[in-house]
Amino acid sequence: MKLVFLGPPGAGKGTQAAGVSAHLRVPHISTGDMFRSAIKNETPTGLEAKRYIDAGQLVPDSVVIAMVQERLAMDDCANGYLLDGFPRTVEQAIALESFSSLDAVVDIAVPDERLMDRLTGRRVCGKCQGTFHISKLADENTCPVCGGSTYQRDDDKPETITARLKAYHEQTEPLIGYYSGLGKVHHEGNCKLITIDGDQKPEDVFKSILTSLE
């Protein structure tokens, strides 16, 4: 099965993608891991991407798309894959369609106010690196595991989360329109768009995804 997972920051997309890929026995391919692997292995696209990154520039779509195509051509993708973090735009979705046909796109939907609560309430222990939510802590400044001091990452501050969600919606709403067939530019293949309520317990989200893919 060939899948794409969509979901805003804080929706638990990475966790669900890892679980579903293990269940289906297909590789979980995240954009970040793919970049790191291609650069480490010094593949042609990895070296090209590294030049842009080292120069402090955004990696162009053409390089990202070539890297995805390179990765999907590997033997472990013969029976399917799960893409996490690609495509991010309609242009990337159209490019993906030119070399691989998807079976389904899973969109994990969570209201913005719940995402704000999840992310801004997250704390990290400076000592053991454990991650906790303040709702589960007796003292939000103290790690319940090792007693170390906890802190809020810059990425989890309200102004940062607001900007990340805005960027996600601007990029993703046209993409959802594309896969649903309702957008100005739309997908014409057999791929189905599945919207999952991500505002549930993680195990219930997982069950909902598997049921929808049957």
Roles of regions detected by a PLM:
Residues 1-214:
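Glycine-rich phosphate-binding loop of ATP-dependent small-molecule kinases
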